[in-house]
Amino acid sequence: MASQGTKRSYEQMETGGERQDATEIRASVGRMIGGIGRFYIQMCTELKLSDYEGRLIQNSITIERMVLSAFDERRNKYLEEHPSAGKDPKKTGGPIYRRIDGKWMRELILYDKEEIRRVWRQANNGEDATAGLTHIMIWHSNLNDATYQRTRALVRTGMDPRMCSLMQGSTLPRRSGAAGAAVKGVGTIAMELIRMIKRGINDRNFWRGENGRRTRIAYERMCNILKGKFQTAAQRAMMDQVRESRNPGNAEIEDLIFLARSALILRGSVAHKSCLPACVYGLAVASGHDFEREGYSLVGIDPFKLLQNSQVFSLIRPNENPAHKSQLVWMACHSAAFEDLRVSGFIRGKKVVPRGKLSTRGVQIASNENVEAMDSSTLELRSRYWAIRTRSGGNTNQQKASAGQISVQPTFSVQRNLPFERATVMAAFIGNNEGRTSDMRTEIIRMMESAKPEDLSFQGRGVFELSDEKATNPIVPSFDMNNEGSYFFGDNAEEYDN
């Protein structure tokens, strides 16, 4: 957490390590990725999946979910203490799709969690390899971010649905550790805090007793994580107020909503990492790639290179557009759901269209859908250029943005102006400016008002040719400043339902 003065790179968070040098980090991230790949290969063998079936993204997701479920200790304990009819707490499973006589068939499988834990540990040199599990969680979270809207969740906590660019990582489980916290958006953490405060308001005992003490520690820790994401002194000072409150209530909720809104212009630092489906790592390991020896980085060229020569398939519903399905998965792979479409499109080398214009639903297929009517097609996950992922929000400035999403959260460290609709954002700040945080509020509003549209973020940073592995020749793209940059504009995506 930034507040304790220990800035670790993502890779260190990702691998749970202390400070390491670049080579050690590359090796330990490589070890984690190799472990996921070995696990996937072994599961395909156990399930007798053909090479083609093993490359199907839906099968990859089922296998990933099984291992996450096998290691979800809290839920496993809960299931054993509260047995529900027809559910075996010791088993996990899901749909596996097989190609039989030229048609896709769904088979529901059940596996002992113990057996899956054994396969996972065996693939990871006998260790629990929590970092690898978190990595899978982040891939699922990135896929959810690209696929679903969180309008309902935002409205429920009193936030504005147009603040969706702050909601990265909103479906990540609590147990995702430091690496999970790093990729959560400002809105996601504000929402978790608001939920806690609301429970405290409704339940007298929430902050009391031994349990309450633990709750309080969790509350303060979460406040520190959020504080560490803000880049201005006034925002951080306001977070100190929220954290130190004796009895958090509506005033703190107001402050958190204010801070979340302010992040539309004074952006927080949110980490971005390219987390790929397990089958991609499996394919690479199977073809003889030694991740630990070669080293790997989640924020450099490596994921791009991996996707350049991996063939992954997806089931496609009868009225879906395969190119749109590919865009959805590409965005998820690079954690680019809230990135400016102009930037994503330039890197990908293909037009990237807003969510509302995509003719595709999510990747996962519901149990009541007819699989036999579906075909499979190759996902086009290659890119024209690559760019370094950012862990900062870029500096602030503004420009015309859309009705659906009024700001972006940059993913790639590439020079551009960051679009946001100043009039819309500022309209939310009329009025409430009294109370103990008034001076900080005034300062924050002043900074937001002085943000300029022509300011460039990530100055001088560019994209790189895929042959330029050492990032020596940045190509700084020029963008049409008036073009639409928001993905969730005019949105008709499905809501995320747990």
Swiss-Prot record:
UniProt motif (Bipartite nuclear localization signal) ranges: 198-216
Database matches in Pfam families: Flu_NP
Coiled coil: none
Annotated localization: Virion; Host nucleus
UniProt feature, compositional bias: Basic and acidic residues: 8-22
Cellular component GO terms held in the UniProt record: helical viral capsid; host cell; host cell nucleus; ribonucleoprotein complex; viral nucleocapsid
Chain positions covered by the region annotation Disordered: 1-22
The keyword Disulfide bond is assigned to this record: no
GO molecular function annotations of the record: RNA binding; structural molecule activity
Biological process (GO), any one: symbiont entry into host cell
Subunit structure, as described in the record: Homomultimerizes to form the nucleocapsid. May bind host exportin-1/XPO1. Binds to viral genomic RNA. Protein-RNA contacts are mediated by a combination of electrostatic interactions between positively charged residues and the phosphate backbone and planar interactions between aromatic side chains and bases.
UniProt family annotation: Belongs to the influenza viruses nucleoprotein family.
Protein name (database record): Nucleoprotein
